[in-house]
């Protein structure tokens, strides 16, 4: 089996590790980028590139378990330049349901908010503080007014 590095978001690392361990995929190693990058997606592509380049010589294959995640196509450009595969799609949360089911869910109800275990555990830091709601609570409805 090819020694494979899986680069994922810190928000999905627990689930990815569970899949790897639960299926005896000892040839795969999981590393993650900080989940807080979702609040600053412009930094995801270069942080991904850094992780790829830092590990390229140690692995036969590298997979990046990110979708676009707000990078405006810049992450895919980095993956193409580095010759690495990613998940594709708009949101990494698509991997939980699959692209077709995710599209169906979000098409049916555009006001979906996907609350994962990670986001629940770190809600204060990632959402309240990360989006500045602790300093500007009046922004709550602007951020979340369209969710149901």
Residue positions per predicted region:
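Short glycine-rich phosphate-binding loop at a beta-alpha junction
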Residues: 61-66
């Amino acid at each position: 089996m090819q020694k494979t590095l899986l680069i994922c978001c810190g928000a999905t690392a627990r689930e990815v590790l569970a899949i790897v361990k639960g299926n005896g995929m000892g040839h795969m190693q999981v590393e993650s980028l900080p989940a807080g990058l979702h609040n600053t997606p412009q930094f995801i592509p270069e942080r991904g590139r850094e992780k790829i380049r830092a590990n390229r010589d140690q692995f036969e294959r590298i997979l990046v378990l990110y979708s676009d995640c707000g990078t405006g196509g810049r992450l895919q450009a980095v993956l193409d330049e580095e010759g690495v595969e990613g998940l594709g799609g708009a949101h990494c949360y698509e991997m939980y349901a699959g692209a077709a089911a995710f599209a169906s869910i979000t098409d049916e109800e555009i006001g979906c908010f996907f609350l994962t275990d990670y986001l629940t555990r770190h809600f204060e830091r990632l959402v309240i503080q990360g989006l500045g709601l602790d300093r500007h609570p009046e922004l709550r409805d602007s951020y979340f007014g369209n969710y149901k």
